[in-house]
Amino acid sequence: MRAARAAPLLQLLLLLGPWLEAAGVAESPLPAVVLAILARNAEHSLPHYLGALERLDYPRARMALWCATDHNVDNTTEMLQEWLAAVGDDYAAVVWRPEGEPRFYPDEEGPKHWTKERHQFLMELKQEALTFARNWGADYILFADTDNILTNNQTLRLLMGQGLPVVAPMLDSQTYYSNFWCGITPQGYYRRTAEYFPTKNRQRRGCFRVPMVHSTFLASLRAEGADQLAFYPPHPNYTWPFDDIIVFAYACQAAGVSVHVCNEHRYGYMNVPVKSHQGLEDERVNFIHLILEALVDGPRMQASAHVTRPSKRPSKIGFDEVFVISLARRPDRRERMLASLWEMEISGRVVDAVDGWMLNSSAIRNLGVDLLPGYQDPYSGRTLTKGEVGCFLSHYSIWEEVVARGLARVLVFEDDVRFESNFRGRLERLMEDVEAEKLSWDLIYLGRKQVNPEKETAVEGLPGLVVAGYSYWTLAYALRLAGARKLLASQPLRRMLPVDEFLPIMFDQHPNEQYKAHFWPRDLVAFSAQPLLAAPTHYAGDAEWLSDTETSSPWDDDSGRLISWSGSQKTLRSPRLDLTGSSGHSLQPQPRDEL
């Protein structure tokens, strides 16, 4: 069901407001809005949350802040105080409602446990915010959870422009989770529908009527029936679960107020809630992953400059070096990769990739490079490309440095890595387990495309590891000194093929016996993380996909002609992967709406 459009006058004001202000015309009478901020143990997300609120393209003189915080065991209160001291005077009104004690609810098992008392207190707070907005004379109130980051600075204008009584901007997450339901049972529980995934994945776009929105939504206080909306106490006839989001959904239904979700635009991100037995560290790790997803998919999150953030302490996480192979002419990839490592507190060192575009056939031969006799791409049948030569030489230079410096073990990343959830923690645990089991290894894939996963065997005593089979990609791997020596000793430049075909030859898992016959010994000891810890940022067919190895010239062609080798299936998304949207995600959804 499509929504009615906003009143023409309001649409015009929302559209012309920024231009009128820039031209020095008196500020247009835009609707007054209350931003309701309810924070508990939100130190990990507050800087980005507040930064997003600061960047909303809406006159602060037409906005009021209603801010409450309670039951904190972190620095949430101090952060909010610091932020309000810096920006509060810019807003039309500020309500500050902190509670320092108690720090816990009596019956809670942990800070993420939702007890009945906690639900009631939250409903009372939201009702206070709603009452303040009405008394202040606001036209709208925006509720936005503190781990919901509105990266689209036009969010308020876009939502108001729909002219709807209750409307939510659809937010993206690390999983299938979002801030709306498409179905609800007569008892007030979540009901699965055929419409949810097409809406969540934006296969259908627009504003759609739904039974519930939560976490972030805009409510009009001038709409018909809006005066009957309430969080607490629940409606006299209320028998549904005692939960603030369900109570409000019932209130909307009882008042005849329609609820919509809009997904025509990318509005921002929301963190997937952790389970009740998990803690703040789990939530922090999840939010870091959300930041990384935003770095890939955009728009990026930007932290407020008005709050003091916990300092980062990057390290090499037990490796002697962390290499990042990156083309100098792809600065966006390089910057994103370094920003991702910084968020995970991993200290990486950029290695300028050998650029295949800059190579000609004579330069390639002067480097001692020659093609492996008979090599053809396994799918397209093409020969080696200059991009693949550059990629191989880039990895080769790292292997040389490992041997020259005697580095015991290193990490190697290409610059198109999408990190899975808790990458650092999972990698650290994996390496600790490998050390504890005294496993002898040369190379461990962290990201790859498995060709025959059903033929791979688990490593006894190491549930997160399998013996690597034939694989594509070299986007992320760990390498030991002994492994680097074996790779160099095989003298691969004299019989080159793509590096992701060379590695399986060296651990004797390549299916082509003719290729393997050129290399001996094939004794590289290779394993792989399972589940994988990294994936490509994009795949062939994605709008943002770009490959400097697949879109390239044949290795001995100096005509400057670029060919996109669409016949290769290496860069396609694996049909075995359970994916959502444009990327694979490692978190399993644990939303509060699965009641």
UniProtKB/Swiss-Prot annotation:
Q: Name one GO biological process term.
A: cell adhesion
Q: Where is the signal peptide?
A: 1-22
Region ranges (Disordered): 548-595
Keyword check for Flavoprotein, yes or no.
no
Main location, first listed in the record: endoplasmic reticulum
Amino acid composition bias (Polar residues), ranges on this chain: 580-589
Residues of this chain annotated as glycosylated in UniProt = 75, 153, 237, 360
The GO terms describing molecular function are: identical protein binding
Q: What is the effect of changing residue 440 to D?
A: No effect on lack of galactosyltransferase activity in a chimeric construct with COLGALT1. Exhibits some galactosyltransferase activity
Per UniProt, which keywords does this protein have?
Answer: Cell adhesion, Endoplasmic reticulum, Glycoprotein, Signal
| Record bears the keyword Signal | yes
Q: Which InterPro entries match?
A: Collagen_mod_GT25, Glyco_trans_25, Nucleotide-diphossugar_trans
Q: Which family does the UniProt entry place this protein in?
A: Belongs to the glycosyltransferase 25 family.
Q: What protein name does the entry list?
A: Inactive glycosyltransferase 25 family member 3
Which species? Homo sapiens (Human)
Identify the coding gene. Answer: CERCAM
